[in-house]
Regions:
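Catalytic NTP-binding/metal-coordinating core of nucleotidyl cyclase/transferase enzymes
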Residues: 2-96, 103
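Catalytic beta-strand-to-alpha-helix segment of the class III nucleotidyl cyclase homology domain
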Residues: 80-176
């Protein structure tokens, strides 16, 4: 049985802010990874070149445009504070990334949403932590997409000024 002292950790209160969050999945990653380890496809080099081409800062840090990018295995996660980054900047960023990965033969499918977020980059504790409502929604949207596409959450479509950024595809909005 836990003591009151042990359970006191649950009294900690955090300040959550709304963030845009994109979850992108590299399609066919397992095959590309197998070729990489056979020295037949430079997966690492192609990912690096696509990231540089799109102007992405590859490490979790404050960036000039306010968008933080994390990449691991076949997943790319982008976050941006809603109060500081306009949704169209985020959409353009994802579009650039998607195009550059496509040039490398690495096709992306994903989702973009918004929600509360807490992140600790691990500077003090030595490990990082990310909890995001928007990430969960973006991941769920990605799993429902059939083809390489970036699905945009219906809840944020009304915040988009440039109607050419997204198009309606069936019952979903997708990045154009």
């Amino acid at each position: 049985m836990a003591t009151k002292e042990w359970d006191s950790i649950d009294k900690t209160q955090y300040k959550f802010e709304d963030y845009y969050c994109a979850f992108l999945d590299m399609l066919g990653y397992k095959e590309k990874m197998n070729l990489f380890f056979q020295n037949k496809f430079n997966l690492y080099g192609r990912v690096q070149r696509a990231m540089r081409g799109a102007g992405v800062e590859p490490t979790p840090q404050e960036t000039p445009d306010g968008i933080v990018t994390r990449i691991f295995s076949d997943s790319i996660i982008l976050t941006a504070k809603k109060s500081e980054v306009h949704i169209e900047v985020m959409l353009n960023y994802v579009a650039q990334l998607t195009a550059w990965f496509g040039y490398e033969g690495l096709f992306l499918r994903g989702g973009i949403s918004c929600g509360k977020l807490l992140e600790d980059f691990g500077y003090e504790e030595g490990f990082s932590f990310l909890a995001s409502e928007g990430l969960v929604k973006a991941y769920q949207m990605e799993t429902q997409a059939i083809y390489p596409m970036i699905v945009v959450d219906n809840d944020i479509v009304s915040h988009i000024d440039n109607s050419e950024c997204v198009i309606k595809n069936g019952n979903k909005y997708i990045l154009n």
